[in-house]
Amino acid sequence: MGHSVAGVCLEEPAVLTAFPSLLHPQDPPQQRDRILFVTAELSDFVKVGGLGDFSAALPRVLKREHSVRVLLPGYRQVLERCRDLRIIGSLPGRAAIPPCEIGLVTLDDGLEVMLVLCPLLYEREGTPYMDDQGNDWPDNHLRFARLCLAAAEIAGGRGAQGWQPGLVHANDWPSALTPAYMAWNGVRTPSLFTIHNLAYQGLCDLQCSAELGLPDEALSHESMEFHGRLSFLKAGIAHAHHITTVSETYAQEITTPEYGCGLHGILKYKVEKRQLSGIVNGIDDSWQPHCDPHLVACFSARQWAGKRANTRYVEERFGLEPGKGPLFAVVSRLVQQKGIDLTLEISDALLQAGGRLVSIGRGEPNLEKAMLELARRHPGQVGVHIGFDETEARRIYAGSDFLLMPSRYEPCGLSQLYAQCFGSLPIARCTGGLADTIVDGVTGFLFREETAQSYLDAVMRAINVYHCPSLLNAMRCKAMAAPMFWSDSVEPYNRLYRRLLRNTAPALRGVRQ
């Protein structure tokens, strides 16, 4: 399974190989550093949130310059969709962590994915993190320690038929033990750890240390001890050579008590050591309104008819009265972090001002119930779907005038970028990646205070713009030109990779090809 990233061109070494007469005898083909990208989600197979999209997109553009392999747990839903999987190695267990095999599959576009094959831990119904009743797996500490230990062993040259990376890139708490296991195993390969959401820390009891085969030093405050528990996330922060977050503003915010989730001290230390930076996410090249096959009709900044066709579809699909006032959209998990309660609080004022509201997503039961009740009280003005469907979401982005994102915090956010691509202006709280990707009054609307009144003021500004068609269209055009695709935003990662590799002794840079 796989897909191609638009705009991939033949790299110079491949051209020279295809035409030997062009190859000068003194010019050997360029060597490519090997990168191991460790993740718990890959949207080709399994996706819970933005990590799955990130893990599918970034390695694909990185492999233009590097030799990249993704390492992923062999979940049941992954194995069911794999073709031509072959076993390339095996790794022993440690303490209560069972042994595993390493499988390799090459996706249709050439991306190589290694799977940690451990049926005891991964072949289950449910999501990567929860059972089908929504409860965390009680052995998550073992499940993801197995992933991290496998990554560390591969970094040390074991388990992958001699394939050894020159750099390891781990992501979020499920793979955060990777840099720590590397350090404890004496593997000096450089490591990068990306924080996608600091609030999810991978906590377990101190007594789990024996099951995880941890050394005594792991129990220190300088390593992964966190208020009497063990934190996978803190282990990644403490032991990785460099830390990134998914936006520049979020990188600053998490060094403060307000946003640091108790880890602001160690993160401030990383800033002082110049080991923490923010890189804004890009988006997949498929988000192109002029050629998106999911849409009812395609459109561009020069031709709006297709956008109106998507609006009519959304109106009919959600039972809204046609063409009466601006259409506001919520495309989000229905959880407190996303500020859904604030949207409910201002909804009556929004509707009284002539607005209409459509929502798609699922989340906390009380917020799902409140959204359904809002739709029941306002038929023709509010439409709600509990659940998520990619095609419906894209049509809502395309058909709406404004996207509501009153997030309490937002490490990066992708919805505002998708909305901008499709000419829907985001209305968002000025935090994290929202602050980095929205220009207030130009490509969307920002508000600062975490209050319903501040939020409502921004909504009313948007309604005023809606009633000025020339200004609305000008903002739409600027918004559609604003988002960066991964093909544009990959270079900061390339620079960081090169710096980490350059600052490591040549003998420790791993095998290259």
Swiss-Prot record:
Single GO BP term: glycogen biosynthetic process
Catalysed transformations (reactions): [(1->4)-alpha-D-glucosyl](n) + ADP-alpha-D-glucose = [(1->4)-alpha-D-glucosyl](n+1) + ADP + H(+)
Class in the EC hierarchy, top level: transferase
A GO molecular-function annotation: alpha-1,4-glucan glucosyltransferase (UDP-glucose donor) activity
Domain of life: Bacteria
Pathway(s) where this gene product acts: Glycan biosynthesis; glycogen biosynthesis
Disulfide cysteine pairs (residue numbers): none
InterPro entries assigned: Glyco_trans_1, GS/SS, Starch_synth_cat_dom
UniProt-listed Enzyme Commission number(s): 2.4.1.21
Binding site for ADP-alpha-D-glucose: K47
Keywords of the record: Glycogen biosynthesis, Glycosyltransferase, Transferase
Protein task: Synthesizes alpha-1,4-glucan chains using ADP-glucose.
Family: Belongs to the glycosyltransferase 1 family. Bacterial/plant glycogen synthase subfamily.
HAMAP family: Glycogen_synth (MF_00484)
The protein, known as: Glycogen synthase
Organism of origin: Pseudomonas aeruginosa (strain ATCC 15692 / DSM 22644 / CIP 104116 / JCM 14847 / LMG 12228 / 1C / PRS 101 / PAO1)
Gene: glgA
